[in-house]
């Protein structure tokens, strides 16, 4: 395949995802993301979540038949999460699951101590994560743009760390969990009004296949 053919392949596959891939299920989209990769798909996914989360989704994708197998496994996990996490936004993209908890669900305003209701939600999530141990969990903290850049960065780090610490205390293996604080750098809405700022104050979880799941999927796919 030459450079021009690759260019149009990426554009075409990007268009499929952008229009919702009406003839494709979510597992088949996993194969598409892996094949197309890169900027075209990333731009589409990035409209639904922060760029950091979108990058994690793309970076974890292996595509092809193995990617479709992983996608089916993620479909099952996402369905279970949707049943018990009514206060979270759960998105299936490619071979990954992205969970978005708004600030008010987990923390008080400008706080990094988990609320009682947050602990209840995280307990439910931890039960599912333990049931499916062959995934990695990336926890990403975000703030709005009010306050100084340094303050917001530190707050986002503390919030991501608080969530990670709680999941570990709920017996989710520490080796599966990583955290990052993005501060105000990765908004999903405008910071010019209260509604937009509330959307930007969030914690995202990106759940991806670990190496064991990927190798098993490749073997099952005959790759």
Predicted regions and their residues:
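Periplasmic OmpA-like peptidoglycan-binding domain that tethers envelope proteins to the cell wall
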Residues: 142-216
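Bacterial N-terminal signal peptides that target proteins for export
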Residues: 1-9
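C-terminal motif of bacterial Sec signal peptides marking the signal peptidase cleavage site
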Residues: 16-20
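Periplasmic peptidoglycan-binding/anchoring modules of Gram-negative envelope and division proteins
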Residues: 83-84, 107-141, 168, 198-200, ...
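Extracytoplasmic/secreted envelope proteins and their assembly/folding machinery
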Residues: 42, 58, 75-78, 82, ...
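Short, low-complexity, glycine-enriched hydrophobic/amphipathic alpha-helices that associate
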Residues: 22-80
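Amphipathic, membrane-active segments
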Residues: 74-101
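Soluble non-cytosolic domains of exported or imported proteins
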Residues: 31, 35, 52, 56, ...
């Amino acid at each position: 395949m030459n450079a021009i053919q690759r260019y149009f392949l990426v554009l075409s596959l990007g268009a499929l995802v952008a229009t919702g891939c009406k003839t494709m299920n979510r597992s088949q989209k996993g194969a598409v993301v892996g094949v197309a990769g890169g900027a075209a798909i990333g731009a589409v996914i990035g409209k639904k979540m922060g760029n950091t989360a979108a990058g994690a989704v793309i970076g974890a994708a292996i595509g092809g038949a193995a990617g479709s197998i992983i996608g089916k496994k993620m479909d099952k996990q996402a369905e279970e999460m949707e049943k018990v996490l009514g206060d979270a936004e759960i998105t299936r993209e490619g071979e990954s699951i992205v969970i978005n908890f708004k600030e008010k669900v987990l923390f008080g305003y400008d706080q990094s101590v988990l609320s009682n209701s947050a602990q209840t939600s995280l307990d439910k999530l931890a039960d599912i994560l333990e049931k499916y141990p062959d995934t990695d969990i990336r926890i990403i903290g975000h703030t709005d743009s009010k306050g100084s850049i340094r303050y917001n960065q530190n707050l986002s780090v503390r919030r991501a760390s608080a969530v990670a610490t709680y999941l570990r205390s709920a017996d989710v293996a520490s080796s599966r969990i990583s955290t990052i604080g993005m501060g105000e750098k990765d908004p999903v809405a405008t910071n010019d009004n209260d509604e937009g700022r509330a959307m930007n104050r969030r914690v995202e979880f990106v759940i991806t296949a670990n190496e064991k799941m990927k190798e098993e999927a490749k073997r099952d796919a005959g790759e």
